[in-house]
Amino acid sequence: MKTIIATVVLSLISTMTMAQTQETKGKVTDENGQPMCCVNVVLLSLPDSTFVTGATTDANGQFTLTSTNRNSLLRLTSIGYETICMPVSQFGGSVQMHENSQTITEVTVKGILPKTRLTGNSLVTTIDGTVLGQSGSAKEMLAKVPGMMQNGDNLEVIGKGSPVIYINGRLMQDADELKRLRSEEIKDVEVINNPGAQYSATVTSVVRIRTKKRQGEGFGFDAEVSNRQNLAYGQSDPGINTNMRYRHNNFEVFGGINWWNYTSVNDSELQQWSYMKQNGNMLCTEQASQLRNDWVGHGLNSHIGFDWMLAENHSVGMRIDRNDVLNTHTEFDQTTDMKQYLLDSSSLLTHDINSNHQHGKVSQPFSWSSNAYYNGRVGKLGIDFNVDFMTSKSNQTDDIEEITNGISSTMSSSNASSAHMIADKLVFTYPLWRGQLSVGEEMSHVSRQEEYNVVGMPITNSSSKVKEDNIAAFAEYACMIPKVGSFSAGLRFEHVGMRYNNLLDPSKSMTRKTDDFFPSLSWAQQWGSLQTSLSYSIKTNRPNYQFLSESMIYINPYSRQQGDPKLDNEKKQELGLNLRWKWMLLGASYERIDNCLTQWSYIYNDEGVILIKSINMDVPVRNLVMYVNASPTWGRFSPNWTIGFQKPDMRQTLADPREASGTRDISYTRPIFFVNLNNTLRLPHSWQIENYFQWQSQGEAMNFRLRNNTATLNFTVQKCWLKNDALCLRASINDVLQRSDQNVTLDCGYYTLNQLSHSNNHTFTLSLRYAFNATNSKYRGTGAGESQKSRLKDK
């Protein structure tokens, strides 16, 4: 009887509690109707405004709050947006936030001021309505985003290297897509400098680009014609890009075609010294080489896809990309003056003059990639599922004519490779306590086969096949604790199984399996205008498949190159700090890398031939990076200035036969300083003038020494016409000073290399773009297997 009474009492208490509990859930969007992530949403009791509970919106802009207090006030805040307060009783389930407009001397400059806010361990920069939204291509624009910089022709997150890039949640697989995407189409950019457990353990930085969602239906298109003229070498690179889309109700179909022509010239001077003992004497082999490699090609990239919103919280879509290389060839010329002499007496033993001309052709029979996704929500449970497929094949042939001391010979080589990948990624999200729990899995299967055949060369043929399976599971929890801050903790487990088959010599085949855990932690807090974040993570870096290839590449009679299938993975520990106050940003990161991947040079045989080989370093590499960014707006002038340094710390003991002990200690601790100055002046009648200056000092990085300062100066003028600047003409001249050549030294003890590379960036580019009824893609695929795709593409 007591049990029955107790059960009844507990049931009544539970019923009363449920009756008093109120659940408030909704969705937050911006002025363009796009979901807003990471908005702080809190409930305050009335009339004293005491904190009751709080949460942050997820990637879909949704939140859920539970409270027993019916008389509450709902408050929503986000940096750069107006605060919203309303009684819970008046909340209709959705709310739209509006950006703050700032006034300077009674002139409204909304639409000019770039806004960057610190959200956890990421920097979110508004592009739409700012000068950054009128910066030409997405590639040009990203170089001006706080936390990023341009290094030669590559984009980097400062201190993190090249990032993995997503466009509307879809993993970008073709780097040239940034040249085709216009800054006018972009809403905001998120730079994540310490990605959490949801990303592959090889990913050290992420850039997420979100395009604008414009209202309306029907047909829209944009087209661009451009020409890039190389002022130093004379080549011309025209290009045509078109994008089309049709939207009706909740269904959208889209596609695009891009025809490109590209030329590249690599012009460098190379000096090499190697030392070895021979018959009790110190033999020195000295090489002085002039190299020039001309790459000429054109191709056609195309894509087609659809996005279908089945219901309010359910979307599916698919995108297929094809990349055709229609005609590509290379012309490589090398002249080498080789001397061998005894170091002590300078007695000349051998003197050869070698010239080498290679004519190469590259064909790509096929290169396809696709992504399909489902994104939805069932009750409070969020679901994000992606499947990716990628397949490619390429063939390269080289005909070589070599003349040594007047004696000519001919050689040839052929390289055929194919790669296939399939991957999936599933992520569940669920609100829990004051935050959100994310759990998921990611799997990929990669197969790559390569065959390298030579005729007339002093090396052997090779044929290999690599298969790799990657299975990952992860969990991450993020929450906000009032007056303490926002916390995120994640753990990722990755199992990698790799099978290397040497098809010509099975005894050299090998199997390797690794199982690793990768934790990540972050904390963020705001005090008034000061925002802070601190993060820690463990990452890895796996060698790309070219590094694993045992194929020996013939360079000249005195040099060879080869990979190593026995390479280990790197292990990275990273600690990051960000501080933001108004328009000032301080970024700092420290990392330690074990088993660092690099290239090393060895004495290959008794004749002094050099073998350049991929290796793991046997000492840790440490790096400290610090920078300060300022992005104010003074009237129509919007500068974006960054100054900082990167300081390595690596110490080695090198084998050096010139030393009595046979070894020599060496250290790399000299910092590299850098300055990036982006300046934009917005003038009446849709005129815009841009100036970019970059300076980098001498210094050291890993096991390389940069021996000279470099400077780059670019200018751009842009003029737009018609409604919403639909027609834009843009002219740019790059590397005006022509002071961006790089002089690099590599010291391996018994071998030293010095290379002076001449810049290929002195160009003039002219582009004209027209957009009609532009409605941006709603594609929401997030992609899977991003690390495997990048390793397949790395050369």
Predicted regions span which residues?
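Face-selective signature of the C-terminal outer-membrane beta-barrel domain
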Residues: 299-327, 354, 358-502, 524-531, ...
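Short, acidic Ser/Thr/Gly-rich low-complexity loop/linker segments typical of extracellular
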Residues: 47-62
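N-terminal periplasmic accessory domains that precede
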Residues: 91-98, 106, 138-141, 175-176, ...
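Outer-membrane beta-barrel signature, preferentially recognizing the C-terminal barrel domain
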Residues: 466-468, 509-512, 540-594, 612-625, ...
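Short, acidic, small-residue-rich periplasmic hinge/interaction motif at the N-terminus
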Residues: 40-44, 77-81, 91-131, 150-152, ...
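Extracytoplasmic beta-strand/coil segments of soluble accessory domains associated
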Residues: 139-171, 210
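Outer membrane beta-barrel strand-and-loop segments of large Gram-negative receptors
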Residues: 421-425, 472-474, 568, 574, ...
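Short acidic/polar hinge/loop motifs at secondary-structure boundaries
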Residues: 66, 144, 170-196
